[in-house]
A protein has these predicted regions:
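An acidic intrinsically disordered interaction segment
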Residues: 7-15, 106-112
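Short leucine-rich amphipathic alpha-helices used at interfaces
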Residues: 6-8, 57, 83, 89-90
Length: 166
């Protein structure tokens, strides 16, 4: 039995993001939640984090099918002088979601406790699949909420993951 059904709400957030991104204009993608973090950078950061954790830390395949073939490399949000288009962001979000879907479909509840290590700032850290999935769900939800609030604050349609998906 896979863990995919447990994460149905995460899928809803992804669907809303995929529905909303293509409708954003270049000017709307430049709206900032905080100085230096326009919507396009937030969406890019969200997508890149999936590759970092799943492909980089957990060694899952698929990074090469995304705009982030080096999971530990520079992300688009690290280059604020190169704004990304709605089309590029949609590709990033959809291609990284395919990695998420693959993991959720293959991983079982028994696999969630498996421990992986990463080195950060010279220190070894231990992470379970469960802890990283929780981190990624919360990370996506936080940044989708950030984008949604920012759009709403500017009088633009926001994203509600709990509206019925048709």
């Amino acid at each position: 039995m896979s863990v995919a059904p447990i994460f149905e709400g995460w899928h809803r957030t992804q669907v809303r993001l995929v529905q909303r991104l293509p409708a954003l204009t270049a000017q709307e993608l430049l709206l900032e939640a905080s100085p230096g973090w326009p919507i396009w950078a937030i969406a890019s950061h969200l997508a890149g984090a999936r590759v970092y954790w799943l492909c980089g830390v957990f060694k899952e395949s698929g990074a090469e099918t995304t705009p982030f073939p080096d999971p530990f490399g520079e992300g688009w949000e690290d280059r604020l002088d190169v704004p990304r288009s709605a089309e590029e962001l949609l590709f990033a979000v959809e291609s990284t979601w395919r990695i998420v879907e693959s993991c959720l479909a293959r991983w079982t509840p028994d696999m969630l406790g498996e421990v992986f290590t990463r080195e950060r700032a010279g220190e070894l850290q231990r992470h379970t699949r469960s802890s990283v999935l929780t981190r990624l769900v919360m990370h996506d939800a936080f940044h989708c909420g950030e984008i949604s609030s920012l759009l709403g604050a500017h009088g633009l349609p926001s994203m509600d993951p709990w509206e019925p998906i048709i």
